[in-house]
């Protein structure tokens, strides 16, 4: 396995690491108070740093693959899979924290299912689809929104506001987070429609 593919795998491995620091542990009544207190105080900031490292591997694997001619079908698959898993897992955590609407997350997940379906139809014809530019823009807006939302509690704390997700303040700081997330949802819809319209032939020619 070449280096770009290893970086994609690393991105997948970092997903549970990120979520561990985002969410308090509560499993069938088991709630370690010391750990959960640490997560509530410092967890999101640590999760943000881990997420940024994971995002940097996304930038690095593509550049290395192109520079050293290490582009493979496995690499195209892993890169796309790692991106989807990372974004969806982190957004699920934000839904659990009541910071992101489940309805908006559903739009993102449905888009990914649709694109995956198109990729499967293309694969049956021997075509492996690499990520398109509009898809990369979509991913970039998602990464920016997620990183901001992760740093949002720290920004609120510096500003003297409460950052309890159960009683989240509505102010310029949180509105910026809402706007950034809405932009990424809009780009998700646009890129999904672009993907669908440009690949309708796979549906028309499917058995």
Model regions and ranges:
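Alpha-helical transmembrane bundles and membrane-interface segments of multipass inner-membrane proteins
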Residues: 1-207
């Amino acid at each position: 396995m070449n280096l770009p593919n290893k970086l994609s795998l690393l991105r997948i491995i970092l997903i549970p690491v990120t979520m561990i620091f985002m969410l308090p542990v509560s499993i069938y009544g088991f709630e370690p108070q010391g750990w959960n207190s640490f997560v509530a105080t410092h967890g999101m900031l640590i999760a943000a740093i881990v997420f940024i490292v994971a995002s940097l591997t996304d930038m690095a694997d593509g550049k290395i693959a192109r520079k050293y001619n290490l582009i493979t079908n496995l690499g195209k698959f892993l890169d796309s899979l790692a991106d989807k898993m990372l974004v969806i897992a982190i957004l699920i955590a934000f839904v659990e924290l009541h910071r992101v609407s489940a309805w908006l997350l559903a739009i993102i997940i449905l888009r990914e299912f649709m694109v995956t379906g198109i990729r499967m139809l293309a694969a049956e014809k021997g075509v492996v689809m690499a990520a398109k530019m509009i898809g990369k823009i979509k991913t970039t807006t998602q990464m920016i929104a997620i990183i901001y939302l992760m740093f949002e509690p720290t920004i609120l704390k510096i500003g003297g506001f409460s950052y309890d997700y159960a009683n989240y303040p509505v102010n310029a700081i949180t509105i910026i987070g809402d706007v950034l997330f809405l932009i990424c949802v809009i780009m998700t819809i646009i890129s999904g429609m672009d993907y669908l319209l440009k690949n309708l032939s796979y549906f028309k020619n499917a058995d």
